[in-house]
Amino acid sequence: MKPAYLLLLLCIIVLVVSNADSQVTFQLGAGAGIRLPMGDYSGETMDYYAGTKYGLSTGYNFQAKARVGLPGFTLVGGIEYGHLSNKGDAEASGQGRVEVAQSIVTVKAGPEITIPLPAAPLTPYLGANVAWHSISGTTTFTGVSRVPSGTFDVGVVSRIGFGINAGVIIKLGPMMNLDLGAEYAFLNPLTKEWKITETSANRVDSYKSLNDEKDPLYAVGNTDHFVAAARSISSLQVMATLMIGL
């Protein structure tokens, strides 16, 4: 599913809402929060250099969110931008430094179920979504053995994933709500890929793409082909979003 399809879905939702009766509500908002790497997306910079994890630490996340309230459930869509980074030693000996940074652009949509609480100023919700992720980044090596010093781009790749979320909607006024939520996002559950963009087989080439699949040329003791297993990447987002009814 490409982002254009999801954006088209959001446009259709807006058209439906503009012609719907009073039982349908529409809200649009923007928010920010933190993004925590989970699974193989976390770890230390030494893990990244060794090819076992990506070694990222907690970063930030921004989003634009649309919520359409329908009888019995809610349909939610959004666009997110997240950034994660880390820096530290490349090896346990302390030789060399690594700085790794990755950015994630996400387009997502899915259903949401609200749990009304009579006379309460807040409404809990549970939801799920299908998401398209575009992932890119940079890696900087300084004084590291087996790779040249410098900054190398991590080529842009896309992955289809899904997320599960929960939160509460706090009513601030007749047309304004505060949405406090958390989402666990699975970024690459369906597709993993090993991609070498250079014809050479030097170690540094392995860091020039996401390369979340096992290196097909992996061999014990081979310092150029060192990624021994596929890596599953996920993240936890905790967000505060101001929603305005239209």
Language model regions located:
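Bacterial N-terminal signal peptides
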Residues: 7-15
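Short glycine/proline- and aromatic-enriched beta-strand/turn motifs that initiate or cap beta-hairpins
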Residues: 21-71, 230-246
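Short coil turns and loop connectors of transmembrane beta-barrels in diderm outer membranes
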Residues: 22-26, 71-73, 117-122, 172-176
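Transmembrane beta-barrel strands of outer-membrane/channel proteins
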Residues: 28-36, 77-83, 126-132, 168, ...
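Extracellular loop and loop/strand-boundary signature of outer-membrane beta-barrel proteins
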Residues: 46-53, 91-100, 147-154, 224-228
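Short sequence motifs at beta-strands and strand-loop junctions characteristic
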Residues: 54-59, 99-106, 154-161, 230-234
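Gram-negative (and chloroplast) outer-membrane scaffold detector with strong preference
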Residues: 65-147, 239-246
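Predominantly the C-terminal beta-signal and adjacent terminal strand-loop region
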Residues: 173-246
